[in-house]
Amino acid sequence: MSFFQENWLLILVAFVSGAMLVWPLVQKRFSPMKELGTLGVTHLVNHQDALLLDVRETKEYEGGRLPNAVHVPLSQLEARAGELARHAARPVIAYCATGARSRMAGAALAKAGFKDIYNLNGGIRAWKDAGLPVEKATT
């Protein structure tokens, strides 16, 4: 018992460290989104007519996008979810610059009734790093 009393801070740090290691796994398990790499994205687009959803802000979008992507910034996603309703039966692949904002988009898409939701792991940066095509947005 004296070990625990003398080393309570060390035990607390060990517990918190362990929780921080496990948390991403728990979060991923209960997320409405599935993660995909660039190969998985190209497969879904080519074989299942997946919708590419760019959730970056307009300035970022204007710098380049994935071919045929639909642009709805994350900040407007809940308000504009009705515009995407006609695509609810299709797989939806959300992406942003690195994959962080598109993960947040998953909850809004699930709330809007989408069932088959994916995140491009690494975002458009991973797409470009893989040498895949990017097109300039038309204004």
Predicted regions and their residues:
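Rhodanese-like catalytic fold shared by cysteine-dependent sulfurtransferases
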Residues: 1-40, 44-50, 58-91, 102-139
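Conserved G/P- and acidic residue-centered "switch" motifs that form tight phosphate/ATP-binding loops
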Residues: 54, 99
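Short cysteine clusters
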Residues: 96
